[in-house]
Amino acid sequence: MGFFVTSANPGKGADLGGLAGADAHCQSLARAAGAGNRTWRAYLSSGGASPVNARDRIGRGPWRNAKGEVVARDLEQLHGDNNLNLQTALTEKGEPVNGRRSQPNTHDILTGSQADGTAFAGSAEDRTCRDWTSGGEGSAMVGHHDREGLRDDAPSRSWNSSHPSRGCGMEALRSTGGAGLFYCFAAD
């Protein structure tokens, strides 16, 4: 396994304890699933004076889900024509994540990223819930792991850059169809 969607939020909405806290959550979930021997990174960008791009944190691929299915061979395919969808975006336990047509809808996945996997550098708008340290004020860019939205357009079908959340707390994340989940990739 080299890719999964977190099965649970660490408990504070989009306050993940920064990138380090999010990476630790990925590592902990992977360890519990028997894949802790790899180096796990959260697919999250951060802004500020020194932006960090999600795509630069996750290694070079290929990435397989818990069932061994390849979701992407490399960074180019991951940010292009990948195999990430409702059937393949599984948790570390190999379980599906509810999509837009399920109850509760949990298809909004935290990324803080643009479609090419880069940060919103220079943007005055918060797209990372204060670099993943806010569980209240702010907003996070989310993607749709099921590739479905309210419209049939590219952002609605984007796995990593669909729309901003209404806030950073769990209630705000739930109100737009999320559960504070995020993607984890093996960087090695």
Enumerate the predicted regions with their spans.
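Secreted/extracellular ectodomain signature
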Residues: 1-188
